[in-house]
Amino acid sequence: MKKYILSILITVLPTGLFAIAGFGLQVAQGQMKVEESVLGGADIPGVTLTNGAFENAFGIGAFLYVDIIPVIDLELDFQAMGNTYDINFVNPIGSMDPIPFAWATVNTYITVRKDVFSLSIPFLAAAKLYSGVGYNMHRTTPVANIEMVENLLGGDILGGDVSSLNENLEDFMTNEDNYDKSNGFHFQAGLQLKLLTFTSQLFYRYTMAEDVVPDKKGFGSMNFRFGFGI
């Protein structure tokens, strides 16, 4: 009898704790398509600055949720996401050595969630569909532009020496003081599965924020989480 009671407690206690809060890891597939941009040309004859195209992005991060407020849950997650592209520059003096660069963004999301539908096996497992809305903050590597390059060439974009421009431009764009900072809102919907103290989630999120993805006012992402209860 004692063994039977003990086995019930071992099962019930972690499950109860799991309902209070949880944490874990998160991976994401950013859904975006950034076209190649060519600056200069007709506006500045003999000068061309090209930022290459890229499609989608991979992200990784961590999350924390709290489930002690009636009706709603609160989530906080941090995520780094990125992809690579090339930067090229040409002026009448010569061509800059191409820069293999990374579009990268570090994101923080605060989300209020509400269950849409749920079912459970007492003390063992649960599943629920949910939706949520929230606020987000971003720090993103900048995109090279004509003004940026002109300043690095000492104000002479037509006749400036480009031999060390690739190093100077990369140093400028990777300096955190020059990152673009922005914020916005998002909505998401997904499925969460719980088994004892383990949880997994699969959800779609749409982020509405400027100055994150070049020339876009928002982007989508598919996200997967795996975590534990506390």
Question: Would you name each region that the model predicts?
Answer:
Residues A19-F23, F58, P70-L74, F123-L129, ...:
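Outer-envelope beta-barrel architecture signal
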Residues F54-I60, A102-T108, A127, K181-F187, ...:
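Residues that define the transmembrane beta-barrel architecture of outer-membrane proteins
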Residues L39-P45, F89-M96, A144-G155, K217-F224:
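Flexible, surface-exposed loop regions and adjacent strand-edge segments
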Residues E36-V38, M81-D86, D177, S182, ...:
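Predominantly the C-terminal beta-signal and adjacent terminal strand-loop region
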Residues A19-D67, G229:
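Short glycine/proline- and aromatic-enriched beta-strand/turn motifs that initiate or cap beta-hairpins
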Residues D43-N51, I93-A102, F172-D177, A209-K216:
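Extracellular loop and loop/strand-boundary signature of outer-membrane beta-barrel proteins
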Residues V27-Q31, F63-L152, I230:
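Gram-negative (and chloroplast) outer-membrane scaffold detector with strong preference
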Residues M1-G22:
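Cleavable N-terminal export/targeting peptides
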